[in-house]
């Protein structure tokens, strides 16, 4: 990353289907992608790819091959806010439903699932915090006051669950032990001014993780789980695997002015996005027609969580009644 543009290098290992009518690789591409080069097994492939309307076709991938596409994007000009965009000095992403194609050329469908390893390079002063999905596996410094980090998500996911955040944020964090005894790190990243208002979001995340273990036997499957709450996120809330992103208005609570309803709403919203870790992320969609399945099931789990967080059993029906007009 620089403050004006980003160079994206995506490398994918592609295996053709046996008996397929064609061995052409057709990738989706959005607006304002500027190709620098295309490589197949490390060799330039200028004669083997064609540009079409919203597509890049690479001809005759007849055996397992490593395809690398290097392209430029300009997040500061991305006013659609789909893909990676820049707002007030921070980079962030929104890829549901078809935003990943605005980052690089890719088979942008929910039934295409891949394991992602993401390396981010940026200026250390402007972008001290570099986040993506999964577990942090390596980091280091570079020349010219730059640094890099590498994130690895061990689980296959569709590209709409990819996330990236780079900017100046501070973290409220804690460590917990899962039911199986693993220690995991929980972090809520915010702009510095919002740090005092982030405590309830972290406590809500802890409650959601514990409840999912006890009620459904579903344990957090990563070494860390992160929430980013920023004033500049455009989507309200998004369940990216291991890196949930929220607009801060939905998860920040000032102890001096927040009401009981505010606290309950934050608990429900944080719970909802965390519960997608299994119902939506690990178990995902075949196509976008199934959106109602992952959202409906997760809303049900959220409502059960909210009811179970009530002070006594008699309050469960009240929580159910309140949930009806909300949905």
Where are these regions (language model features)?
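Hydrophobic alpha-helical and helix-loop surface patches within well-folded domains
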Residues: 151, 180-327
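Acidic/His-enriched low-complexity segments
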Residues: 1-224, 249
């Amino acid at each position: 990353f620089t403050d004006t543009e980003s160079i994206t290098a995506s490398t994918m290992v592609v295996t053709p289907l046996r008996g397929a009518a064609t061995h052409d690789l057709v990738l989706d591409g959005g607006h304002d992608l500027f190709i620098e080069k295309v490589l197949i097994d490390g060799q330039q492939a200028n004669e083997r790819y064609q540009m079409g309307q919203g597509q890049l076709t690479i001809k005759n991938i007849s055996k397992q091959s490593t395809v690398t596409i290097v392209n430029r994007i300009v997040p500061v000009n991305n006013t659609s806010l789909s893909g990676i965009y820049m707002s007030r000095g921070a980079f962030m992403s929104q890829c549901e439903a078809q935003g990943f194609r605005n980052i690089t050329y890719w088979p942008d469908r929910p039934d295409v699932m891949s394991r992602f390893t993401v390396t981010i390079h940026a200026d250390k002063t402007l972008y001290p915090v570099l986040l993506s999905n999964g577990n942090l596996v390596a980091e280091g410094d570079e020349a010219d006051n730059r640094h890099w980090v590498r994130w690895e998500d061990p689980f296959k996911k569709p590209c709409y669950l990819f996330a990236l955040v780079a900017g100046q944020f501070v973290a409220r964090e804690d460590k917990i032990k899962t039911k199986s005894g693993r220690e995991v790190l929980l972090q809520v990243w915010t702009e510095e001014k919002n740090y005092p208002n982030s405590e309830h979001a972290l406590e809500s995340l802890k409650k959601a993780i514990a409840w999912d273990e006890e009620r459904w036997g579903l344990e957090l499957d990563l070494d860390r789980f992160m929430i980013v709450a920023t004033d500049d996120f455009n989507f309200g809330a998004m369940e990216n695997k291991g890196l949930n992103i929220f607009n801060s208005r939905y998860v920040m609570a000032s102890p001096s002015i927040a009401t009981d309803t505010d606290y309950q709403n934050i608990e429900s919203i944080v719970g909802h996005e965390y519960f997608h870790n299994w119902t939506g992320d690990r178990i995902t969609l075949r196509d976008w027609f199934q959106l109602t399945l992952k959202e409906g099931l997760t809303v049900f789990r959220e409502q059960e969580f909210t009811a179970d967080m009530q002070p006594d059993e008699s309050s469960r029906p009240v929580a159910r009644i309140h949930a009806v007009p909300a949905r």
